[in-house]
């Protein structure tokens, strides 16, 4: 199914024309929803600290999670205490839940498990972003909130909107769902504060981001094996665009005996992956690794990657955060 969807969205498959009437309906529904917030018929909840929303206008992976991790580290370096909120996609969460390093990806979601495993940041997940933000502020001394994937969740007040675009696939056929991959029209890019292009050329007023491989690490934290870079590996990826990961491995000099793409947010079975690897080293993404660490074999590995953005982006982002923080502090003191 995903193969057909990709052909419709990114390769000009003629089935898109049959889906266009549904895209028109989707556009109407989303326009009405935005109007309800704009007219004040639905309320947006402001928060006492700067809120950065990291999202996209397309369905599927674009590099949001590495961007969130980059922002966490950038803000910490400048003396801020950031916290993160997320939906926890794929997990059955009742109300809100604080994410800990001991939580499984199944219980909190792939991305939250990865973010907390990598950074140890205070993080709360739940279906309603406003509730997660309030819980985060109530339980942790955070002074900036990063919302992982909440661009279309308009009930959450936000001060900075950052959109991440897949530099290889762009906006596809530029149609709204279901004929195309867009959650909102391309016009939305003109309204956000920052547009980050992952792995492709940036246009004027956009920022280029590269994902730089940093280390090959064992999926099983107790493993004592040493990775042999001369041995062919079986590559797997359950992300929005698996081909991007396989290309990265090839560019880094890995020999791929086999590559297999799974659906995004795929739940994995130990026996299936053991059969796939067939005693060869199994190489996966960091997001896949958090779902496999409890049953990982000695020769299962993941490639950690770090987002790289320009000093100009850092300067502009930090300037905006400081400005918003000062304004909110002044308002809280009646200035």
UniProtKB/Swiss-Prot annotation:
Catalytic activity: a lipid A disaccharide + ATP = a lipid IVA + ADP + H(+)
EC number: 2.7.1.130
Record keywords: ATP-binding, Kinase, Lipid A biosynthesis, Lipid biosynthesis, Lipid metabolism, Nucleotide-binding, Transferase
Annotated GO MF terms: ATP binding; tetraacyldisaccharide 4'-kinase activity
Bilayer-crossing regions: none
Example of a GO cellular component annotation carried by this entry: plasma membrane
CDD domains the UniProt entry points to: SIMIBI (cd01983)
Cited Pfam families: LpxK
GO biological process terms, semicolon-separated: lipid A biosynthetic process; lipopolysaccharide core region biosynthetic process
Binding site for ATP: 58-65
Pathway: Glycolipid biosynthesis; lipid IV(A) biosynthesis; lipid IV(A) from (3R)-3-hydroxytetradecanoyl-[acyl-carrier-protein] and UDP-N-acetyl-alpha-D-glucosamine: step 6/6
Alphabetical list of HAMAP family matching this protein: LpxK
UniProt family annotation: Belongs to the LpxK family.
Task performed by this protein: Transfers the gamma-phosphate of ATP to the 4'-position of a tetraacyldisaccharide 1-phosphate intermediate (termed DS-1-P) to form tetraacyldisaccharide 1,4'-bis-phosphate (lipid IVA).
Name the record gives this protein: Tetraacyldisaccharide 4'-kinase
UniProt organism field: Shewanella sp. (strain MR-7)
């Amino acid at each position: 199914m995903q193969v057909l969807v990709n052909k419709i969205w990114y390769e000009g498959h003629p089935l898109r024309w049959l889906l266009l009437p549904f895209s028109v309906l989707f556009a109407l529904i989303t326009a009405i929803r935005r109007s309800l917030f704009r007219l004040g018929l639905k309320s947006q909840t402001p928060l006492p600290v700067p809120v950065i929303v990291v999202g996209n206008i397309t369905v599927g992976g674009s590099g949001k999670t590495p961007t969130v991790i980059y922002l966490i580290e950038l803000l910490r370096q400048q003396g801020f205490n950031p916290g993160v909120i997320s939906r926890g996609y794929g997990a059955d969460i009742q109300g809100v839940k604080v994410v800990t390093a001991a939580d499984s990806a199944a219980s909190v979601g792939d991305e939250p498990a990865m973010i907390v495993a990598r950074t140890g940041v205070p993080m709360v997940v739940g279906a309603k972003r406003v509730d997660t933000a309030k819980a985060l502020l109530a339980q942790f001394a955070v002074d900036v909130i990063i919302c992982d994937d909440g661009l279309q969740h308009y009930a959450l007040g936000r001060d900075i909107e950052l959109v991440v675009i897949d530099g290889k696939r762009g906006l596809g056929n530029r149609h709204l769902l279901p004929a195309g991959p867009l959650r909102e029209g391309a016009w939305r890019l003109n309204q956000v504060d920052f547009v980050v292009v992952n792995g492709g050329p940036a246009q004027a007023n956009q920022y280029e981001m590269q994902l730089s491989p940093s280390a090959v690490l064992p999926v099983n934290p107790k493993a004592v094996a040493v990775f042999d870079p001369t041995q062919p590996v079986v590559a797997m990826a359950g992300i929005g665009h698996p081909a991007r990961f396989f290309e990265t491995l090839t560019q880094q000099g890995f020999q791929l005996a086999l590559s297999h793409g799974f659906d995004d947010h795929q739940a994995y079975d130990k026996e299936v992956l053991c059969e796939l690897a067939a005693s060869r080293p199994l190489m996966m993404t960091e997001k896949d690794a958090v779902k496999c660490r409890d049953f990982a074999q000695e020769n299962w590995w993941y490639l950690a990657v770090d987002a790289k953005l320009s000093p100009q982006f850092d300067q502009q982002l930090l300037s905006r955060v400081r400005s918003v923080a000062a304004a909110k502090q002044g308002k809280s003191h009646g200035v």
